[in-house]
UniProtKB/Swiss-Prot annotation:
Transmembrane segments: none annotated. Its main location: secreted. One of its GO terms (cellular component) is fungal-type cell wall. Residues 1-21 form the signal peptide. It holds the Pfam family Hydrophobin. Belongs to the fungal hydrophobin family. Induction: Expressed after 12 to 24 hours post induction of asexual development, which correlates with the development of metulae and phialides. Not expressed in hyphae and strongly induced during development. One of its GO terms (molecular function) is structural constituent of cell wall. This is Class I hydrophobin dewC. Keywords: Conidiation, Disulfide bond, Secreted, Signal, Sporulation. It comes from Emericella nidulans (strain FGSC A4 / ATCC 38163 / CBS 112.46 / NRRL 194 / M139). It is found in: Secreted; Spore wall.
Length: 162
């Protein structure tokens, strides 16, 4: 069971690392326009948010270090790269006036958020227990849907805006 969960998380981490390493097209910049549909494709049920700061100095107990996070490389890779960092001061970009137009027609212009862009939990999930220290199990959302084999309670996950 631990190997299955570890391999799923490792695949997700690898996907995020590959996406962030993707080269830009000639003449492109970080001034892309993100539509509401792209936000939905990027974040799913979470909200695209702008966070003021992140704290990557997350420390693990000895028990946590020997668990699932240790299988993923411990604090030397997963946590130090900011993939599970603690974000603070996050506000939904959809709630900032003028960024998302009515019906999503206007789009989100990169540069409106000069800090950290992340997909943050929509808040409709409920923590029901722990698989092991540091890995939480979530109750299905209000629609009774639980996506994935094991859902992990991570409030915000960074997004690479191209």
């Amino acid at each position: 069971m631990q190997f299955t969960i570890a391999s799923l998380i490792a695949t997700a981490v690898l996907g995020l690392q590959m996406a962030s390493a993707a080269p830009h097209a000639p003449g492109s910049s970080n001034a892309a326009i993100i539509s509401q549909a792209q936000e939905q494709n990027t974040c799913g049920n979470a909200h695209l948010s702008c966070c003021e700061s992140t704290d990557n100095s997350v420390s693990l107990t000895q028990e946590e270090e020997e668990g699932l996070l240790h299988l993923l490389g411990g604090t030397s890779s997963v946590l130090s790269d900011g993939l599970l960092g603690k974000y603070s001061g996050c506000s939904s970009l959809a709630s900032v006036e003028g960024i998302l137009g009515a019906g999503g027609n206007q789009g989100l212009v990169s540069g409106q958020c000069n800090n950290h862009v992340a997909c943050c939990d929509a808040g409709d999930n409920e923590l029901v227990g722990f698989l092991e220290p540091g890995v939480a199990v979530l109750k299905p959302n209000s629609d009774g849907i639980q996506n994935g084999l094991a859902n992990v309670a991570v409030p915000c996950v960074p997004v690479q805006v191209l």
